[in-house]
């Protein structure tokens, strides 16, 4: 079931590709979305760039949100962070941009529009400076971050879009199968 005509799950890549490691969220999004994988049609991939609060309307009405970003928590550069509860990092201004993701999520919560499930996969940046190449530690962390993002995306999709809504019978269910309207 789509909410307000939107896919229930949004994968949001954020950052500035012109500031080296700050663009890692966009790189993760690019590597995740077109990889030839048959992702569920209930998922939308969005390059949020540096739009900040302008993204409020894009996340409103979703059931789940996976954010891909540079995350600065003071760990070693290239450390992959998987944050299943965004409020844990909100006070630390975790993202590497001025208009950060925590602010976006806090405002959407105040407006009653924050998705029920929000997770963040990010990589600790090494160098935020003019340039388009990722630093070596961040580039080396991409495969691990992609693996974490894939796993979380599957988890979020299962939580946000139950199988019966997708017209499939759950494996562990012995109840009647739900047949989508028009398929009888």
Where are the predicted features?
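Nucleotide and nucleotide-moiety/phosphate-recognizing core
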Residues: 2-12, 17-88, 160
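Residue-level signal for pocket-adjacent positions within structured domains
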Residues: 13-14, 75-78, 96, 123, ...
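Conserved active-site and cofactor/substrate-binding residues in soluble primary-metabolism enzymes
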Residues: 23, 27, 50, 96-102, ...
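Helix-loop-strand module that forms the ligand-binding subsite of alpha/beta enzymes
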Residues: 70-118
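Phosphate-binding/catalytic loops
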Residues: 101-184
């Amino acid at each position: 079931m789509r909410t307000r005509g939107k896919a229930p799950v949004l994968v949001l890549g954020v950052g500035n590709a012109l500031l080296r490691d700050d663009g890692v969220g966009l790189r993760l999004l690019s590597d995740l979305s077109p990889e030839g994988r048959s992702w569920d049609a209930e998922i939308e991939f969005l390059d949020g760039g540096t739009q900040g609060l302008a993204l409020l309307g894009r996340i409103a009405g979703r059931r789940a949100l996976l954010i891909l970003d540079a995350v600065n928590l003071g760990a070693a550069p290239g450390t992959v962070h998987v944050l299943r509860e965004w409020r844990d990092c909100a006070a630390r201004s975790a993202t590497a941009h001025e208009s950060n993701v925590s602010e976006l999520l806090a405002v959407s919560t105040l407006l009653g529009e924050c998705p029920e499930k929000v997770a963040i996969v990010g990589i600790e940046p090494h160098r935020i400076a003019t340039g388009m190449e990722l630093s070596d530690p961040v580039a080396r962390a991409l495969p691990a971050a992609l693996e974490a993002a894939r796993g979380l995306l599957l988890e979020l999709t299962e939580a946000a879009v139950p199988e019966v809504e997708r017209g499939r019978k759950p494996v562990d269910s012995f109840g009647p199968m739900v047949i989508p309207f028009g398929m009888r």
